[in-house]
Amino acid sequence: MTDLMNKLAAVVAVASLAITLVAAGFAACAAFPQTTEMLAEAFSGNGNPGTPFSHDELVQAAVATRDYTVGSNDREAVFSMLHAINEGAGTPYADAAPDELAAAPEEYTLPADALSHLDDVYHVVAGARIGLIVVALVAVAACAHMAVRVGRRALGGVLMAAGIAVIAVFALLAAWVVADFNGFFAAFHSLFFANGTWTFSYDSLLITMYPPEFWIGMGAVWLAATGLLSIASVVVGALLRRKRA
């Protein structure tokens, strides 16, 4: 019975640690406004020279929209931002009331369908955050069990297995992104959102702030963070599995 429990703990440890490594990469993307600001500085406005907003205004909008989507979800704050950038750019909606700004063309504002999609993202992220914290705690507990009840070499095996599994999966996903970014992007969104709720015109403010290059960059950040942590997991695991002299 003890052997069975230890094997079960090993499986749980590998699975929960692998999920936690992936989640850590997502946290690097979503938890820090600096990530959005860096990528917006590099890519916002790409492909839409006709946007009424300056690059700095688009970066300001991208950071504020990121807070609405994965942070405060404060609609008043996001409309305050929309008013500020329209006023700064001197658009026809510079002095528009909130309801008029909400009904403006999507080149100037975040219309109802865009805000609805951002609300959907907020709810997915909020729910995932709780679940991933629980998974991380399970990973810590299962790894502690392996270290205390089975031994350091068993823990090393868990660390290596989780890291190698994540590296293999991310290598396949990276190849998919390189071969067909649009297909990957569509498949990823279809996991969480209904068809038709996350597509917007290329000259909309939302896509102007976050063009495809922005999301490729965000994926690179996720890949780098998760990849480095996974490599560290493999290295530490290999060290733990070494026989002591």
Indicate where each model-derived feature is located.
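Individual transmembrane alpha-helix segments
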Residues: 73-134, 212-223
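Short, membrane-exposed interhelical loops at transmembrane-helix boundaries
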Residues: 194-216
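Hydrophobic secretory-pathway targeting helix
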Residues: 1-37
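Aromatic-rich transmembrane-lumenal/periplasmic boundary elements in polytopic membrane proteins
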Residues: 22-76
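Juxtamembrane interface at the cytosolic side of transmembrane helices
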Residues: 1-11, 133-185, 231-245
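N-terminal type II signal-anchor transmembrane helix
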Residues: 14-28, 221-236
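Juxtamembrane non-transmembrane "cap" segments at the membrane-aqueous interface
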Residues: 178-202
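Membrane-interfacial loop-to-transmembrane-helix junctions in polytopic alpha-helical membrane proteins
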Residues: 2-12, 114-127, 152-158, 209-212
